Amino acid sequence: VISMHQVGFTNAGASLGTALTSGHASLLKRYTQEVLLLYDSDDAGVRAALRAIPILREAGVSSRVVNLKPHKDPDEFIKALGAEEFEKRLEQAMDSFMFRVHMAEREFPMEEPQGQNRFFERCAQMLLELSDELERNLYIEAIVKDYRNSGISVENLKKRVGALAMKGTPAEQRIQPKPVGAGQQLSLIHISEPTRLQLIS
């Protein structure tokens, strides 16, 4: 956070010692419409981001995820590449739903038909979480675009979502991000636009 302030990202803060909560998300909602997540680029940081995304969404705050690799955190990134490159990474932040999709991909052997099938089943489960039909259809198209080499089509994915909706998805099958320990650090950044906020660690 200090490093960010020093290079001009002056609306930065950190929860320091606790994971993001619904209370934090409600507070953020008072000041911004969008949050950028900049957790550490290691596995713990990924889990923290996955946990934060639905909490923010529930509070009505949209989110995107910033890729800091090959550096671990904003401090390392800024020291190595500077504020201008850091700003570019912020601008390239990934939509949080698609971030969840790409992280889910890691769990399946995508070189095998069975792995691909299970992955798209997971995608369908996540799509069912979206109550707005237009939003759901837009993400279906985005998934198909990103994974067109796997042979998935908009029609096929819509059918999979529809089939799950008809029979209902058991609670134990729904996606639940792994919990983040209480020691996970969270940081917040607010860029110049008053309607956009960003989260880092």
How would you name each of these model-derived features?
Residues 2-10, 31:
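Alpha-helix C-terminal capping segments
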Residues 10-17:
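Short hydrophobic/aromatic-enriched beta-strand-loop microsegments
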Residues 19-35, 39-188, 192, 196:
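A charged alpha-helical hairpin associated with nucleic-acid processing machineries
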Residues 199:
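Cationic, low-complexity basic patches in intrinsically disordered or flexible, solvent-exposed regions
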